């Protein structure tokens, strides 16, 4: 705040970091998980083991061990996740994000019951850990998203995104995307769901 006491992003980040200081931490090998104290008792049993499983599978498949530690932060308030990720509240539609060695995501409390499943979101973001590190952060978005969605489907049959009908209709109407158009489609709210499916 030394330069601008009214900078909204700085204010948001400092406020969020104050709440993040109260989170509890679990360290398991190359993985560090930060959880809200109110969720620790339940989520500690699931988050670390699922992350370990995903990274073991990916490391074997891609013949690459990601540099760690890998930090996973789960937020019970979506706006805290958004501020931690981009500095501002909102981020409508986003459930998780990855920066190579840092994964942020909504916890189950951040959404209405039954609205989303945190496990495929974590699996998806850990897929990004692999692609971002393997490419030294130089992978096109369509490719990293495509690999993560593909890996979600392999992680559990229940996790696959439903997109066959939407894709078939777009394809039948000549509205599917070419490889050249795919990256830009991730910036278009009307095309992003189809872009995730096509990329996978």
Question: Where are the regions that the model predicts?
Answer:
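Peptidyl-prolyl cis-trans isomerase
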Residues: 144
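Acidic, S/T/G-rich, low-cysteine, solvent-exposed domains in lumenal/extracellular/periplasmic regions
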Residues: 199-200
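Juxtacatalytic substrate-recognition/specificity segment
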Residues: 23-141, 151-160, 167-196
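Short domain-boundary/entry signatures in modular proteins, especially
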Residues: 14-24
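Alpha-helical protein-protein interaction scaffolds
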Residues: 1-16
């Amino acid at each position: 705040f030394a330069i601008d006491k009214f900078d909204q992003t700085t204010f948001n980040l400092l406020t969020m970091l104050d709440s993040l200081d109260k989170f509890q931490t679990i360290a398991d090998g190359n993985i560090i998980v930060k959880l809200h104290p109110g969720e620790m008792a339940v989520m500690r049993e699931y988050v670390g083991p699922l992350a370990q499983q995903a990274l073991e599978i990916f490391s074997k498949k891609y013949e690459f061990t990601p540099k760690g530690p890998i930090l996973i932060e789960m937020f019970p308030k979506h706006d805290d996740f958004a501020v931690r990720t981009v500095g501002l509240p909102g981020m409508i539609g986003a459930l998780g994000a990855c920066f190579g060695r840092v994964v942020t995501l909504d916890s189950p409390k951040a959404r209405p019951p039954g609205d989303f499943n945190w496990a495929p979101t974590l699996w998806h973001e850990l897929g990004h850990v692999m692609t971002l590190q393997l490419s030294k952060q130089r992978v096109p978005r369509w490719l990293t998203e495509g690999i993560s969605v593909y890996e979600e489907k392999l992680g559990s049959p229940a996790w696959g995104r439903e997109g066959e009908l939407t894709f078939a209709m777009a394809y039948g109407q000549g509205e599917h995307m070419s490889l050249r158009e795919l990256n830009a489609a991730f910036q278009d709210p009307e095309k992003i769901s189809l872009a995730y499916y096509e990329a996978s």
